[in-house]
C-alpha cells in the first residue's frame, strides 16, 4: 500500500468496522464518546519530534549498533503512581542501562513500560469466585480490581484518569532524567552497592571495570554535564482503542498521524489478527510500533505482519517482541529469524523473557522462575548467533521495589517467601535486585556478541 494512502488521516477510523478483541463492555457508549471527545482536546503527552528520534535510535538497534532496554510494571495502577514508586522504577532502569551500555559497548535506548500501561488483555471476559460472576479486571483504565459489581463495571471516566495519571508520571520521569538524578556517576555508585553484596560476587569484575572506565573518563576530561541527562522514552500496549484513538493527532510538520499517548506502542499476542482492528489502526500511525510474537507464530504470519505494518521497510519502524518460553525459544525463534532475514526485512528483535514463563504455585500465586527468565534470554542470544541476526533488546516486567513475586535470583526467593511481599495485581515482576542481576547476565551475553 502506498504510504500516502496508508497515512491518510481520514482512514484513522477504518478500524471501527473491523473485528476487535479485548475491549471493555462499556455500559453506556454515549458516555465513552463524550469522554473520547474530551480526551481529544487534551494536550499530547509526547511530541512527534521525540517519536521520530526514538525511531532513529531503534533503527540503530535493528542494525546491531544499539540495544533497547524496555521495562516497567505488568499493569500500572492509579494508586501506584507515587513519586517513590516512579523514582525507584526509573532508577532501576537507569542502573540496568549503565551495566548494559558497558557490556554492549554501544548505546542503550531506555524505555519505560510506564505512563500508559493501564490496560490488560484477559484470557476470559468474566471471573467467577464462589457463586458470583463479574467482569474480569481489565486494568485501572477500564475497571477496578475489587471483586464487587460496582468496582468491576467499566467506567469511561477511568480513561480520563489514565490520561492525567500518565501525564503526572511522565512529568516526574522527565524531571528525574533531565535534572541530574540520572548522572552516570551517581547511577554507577548505586550499582557498586549491589555488586558488593556477597551474593552478587560474580558481578564484581564488571562493576570494577565500569568504575575504572568512569575514572578514566573523568581523568580524560569527558563532559560529565552531558552524562547528567538521559533520553528516556515511554511505551505501552496499545489496547484500548477508546483511549488510543483520541490521543492520535495530526503532526503539524508533516500532516501525518502520530499516537501521542506514548513514544512507542505495541500490539499484544491476543490482538494481532491480520484483519483485526488493532493491526489496521497501528498500520496508520507514524510511531515506531511493536508486535508480540508467541511460540506458535508461523514464519508466514511474521512476514504478513511486516507487509501490513511496515510496507516501506522503514528502519526503526517495526519491532518484534518474542515471548516464547524458556523451553520453546530455541526451537520456535530460529525459523522466524531465518524467514524474516531471507525476506530482506530488518525489524528490531527484542526478547520478552517474562510472558512465556508463568507458573502457578500450589498455594495459588502466579509466579515466574528467575532461572527460566535467564534461560529464555540466553536462548534468544543463541538463536541470533546461529542465524546471524542482531539480538536487539530486552523487554521486562519489573519494579524498583523489594517485592517477592518471582522465584530465585541471588536472594533465593522461594515459594514460602512469595507471601511476604506479593503486590502485583497482575503478573509477577522482577524486583530491584533481580532486575540488576538480569542486567549483569545480559551484559555478559552482550560481551560475547
Predicted region positions:
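Long, contiguous, compositionally biased segments that the model treats as domain-scale units
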Residues: 1-140
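Glycine-rich, charged/polar anion/phosphate-binding loops
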Residues: 53-55, 275-278, 305, 334-336
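Short coil-to-beta-strand
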Residues: 64-65, 349-351
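Short acidic (Asp/Glu) and glycine-rich catalytic loops that position anionic groups and cofactors
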Residues: 67-73, 283-285, 314-316, 355-360
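Anionic group-transfer/hydrolysis microenvironments
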Residues: 72, 112, 294, 354, ...
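Active-site-facing alpha/beta catalytic cores
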Residues: 76, 81-325, 368, 393-395, ...
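Non-transmembrane, aqueous-exposed alpha-helical and coiled segments at domain scale
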Residues: 302-305, 311, 317-349, 355-410
